[in-house]
């Protein structure tokens, strides 16, 4: 069964799914372009908001192993409407609080909940687009461009008003979508109703604690001088103990939360290695920000525009991906072209970091970075 009632026209169904993607996918506890405004507005050090940014991703990861069981446990309309209302309330909380730990915790919960809505859109869109390969080419291209656009407007709204207004806007959009979903979605189950008691909540807690403590170390390490800080040492020990307990528990469960057997497959190991390499290339964003803001003197809005320059490259990568998967060609050359584009971006920027660097000179390296990311 799909998401919407039988009387809803197909174009309206597609429009609703696009609106859900536009609102839910960029949603987070913090927005990267907003961090400097949040630091100035709350008087809290930047590291808390970096930690909150990690927390959103950790929440999404924690939801992944149980997301299908959640999908089949509740009626479609009830689940999506309640989740949108909760996301709207959490966004409003972030707009009104100046307590950093509240923002960190809401970011974690927002990540968990937005993943539950996202999975509702995966299967209908995959069927509509006709194949997994084409779906990934279209879907991830759309999401990557959407993230760049939302980051830009987050900065623009923060400059014209304040950083709280973007959270209020996100909250209002969630409430409006909840009303539309209540009208257009059906109140039936996706498939056979399944119980939740097979979900191991302790494993989820251990998973979250492992990565939240690790994210704390990565976020606050430099600020607290790494191993010279008791907090960093204690967080590192807590992350290690949590991971050890998580691994031991998975070995004793009949239905483990995470199966470590997947890490014995060569495809998974190769994929993890490529993700690590991609992460290293994407890590150059921090160097790029230091150069653009600290050396060239760009303001936050101009700096956000640089990320918009990646959109044509991302779009081209998505178009190539669709044709590549449609022709069922081997992925080696496609992946190689992406890493080659990333390498070219890094080389160009290495030789271009001078005070005479013009704004127009950003177009080529950012296009290559976008293509590599896509």
Q: Which residues does each predicted region cover?
A:
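Extracellular/periplasmic helix-loop-helix junction of adjacent transmembrane segments
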Residues: 34-63
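Discrete transmembrane alpha-helix packing/kink hotspots characteristic
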Residues: 31, 59-64, 117, 146-151, ...
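Small-residue hotspots at the loop-to-helix junctions and early N-terminal turns
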Residues: 43-50, 137, 229-235, 300-308
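Helix-breaking motifs and short loop linkers at transmembrane-helix boundaries and internal kinks
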Residues: 43, 75, 93-101, 297, ...
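Short hydrophobic/small-residue motifs within alpha-helical transmembrane segments
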Residues: 56-58, 144-146, 311-313
């Amino acid at each position: 069964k799909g998401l919407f009632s039988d009387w809803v026209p197909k174009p309206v169904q597609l429009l609703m799914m696009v609106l859900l993607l536009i609102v839910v996918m960029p949603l987070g506890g913090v927005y990267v372009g907003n961090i400097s405004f949040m630091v100035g507005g709350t008087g809290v050090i930047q590291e808390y908001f970096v930690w909150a940014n990690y927390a959103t991703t950790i929440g999404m990861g924690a939801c992944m192993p149980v997301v299908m069981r959640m999908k089949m446990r509740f009626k479609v309309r009830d689940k999506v409407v309640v989740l949108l209302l909760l996301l709207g309330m959490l966004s409003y909380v972030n707009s009104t609080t100046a307590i950093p730990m509240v923002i960190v915790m809401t970011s974690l919960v927002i990540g968990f909940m937005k993943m539950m809505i996202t999975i509702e859109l995966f299967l209908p869109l995959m069927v509509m687009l006709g194949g997994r390969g084409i779906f990934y080419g279209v879907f991830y291209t759309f999401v990557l461009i959407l993230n760049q656009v939302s980051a830009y407007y987050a900065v623009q709204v923060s400059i014209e008003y304040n950083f709280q207004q973007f959270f209020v806007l996100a909250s209002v959009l969630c409430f409006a979508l909840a009303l539309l979903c209540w009208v257009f979605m059906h109140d039936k189950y996706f498939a056979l109703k399944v119980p939740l008691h097979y979900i191991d909540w302790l494993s989820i807690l251990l998973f979250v604690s492992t990565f939240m403590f690790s994210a704390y170390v990565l976020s606050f390490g430099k600020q607290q001088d790494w191993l010279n800080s008791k907090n960093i040492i204690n967080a590192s020990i807590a992350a290690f103990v949590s991971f050890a307990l998580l691994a031991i528990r998975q070995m004793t469960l009949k239905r483990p939360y995470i199966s470590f057997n997947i890490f014995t497959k060569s495809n998974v190991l190769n994929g993890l290695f490529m993700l690590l390499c991609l992460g290293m290339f994407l890590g150059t964003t921090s160097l790029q920000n230091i150069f653009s803001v600290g050396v060239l003197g760009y303001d936050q809005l101009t700096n956000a525009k640089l990320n918009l320059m990646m959109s044509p490259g991302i779009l081209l990568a998505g178009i190539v991906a669709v044709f590549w998967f449609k022709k069922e060609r081997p992925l080696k050359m496609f992946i190689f072209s992406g890493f080659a584009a990333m390498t070219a971006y890094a080389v160009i920027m290495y030789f271009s970091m001078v005070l005479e660097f013009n704004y127009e000179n950003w177009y080529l390296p950012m296009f290559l970075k976008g293509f590599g990311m896509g």
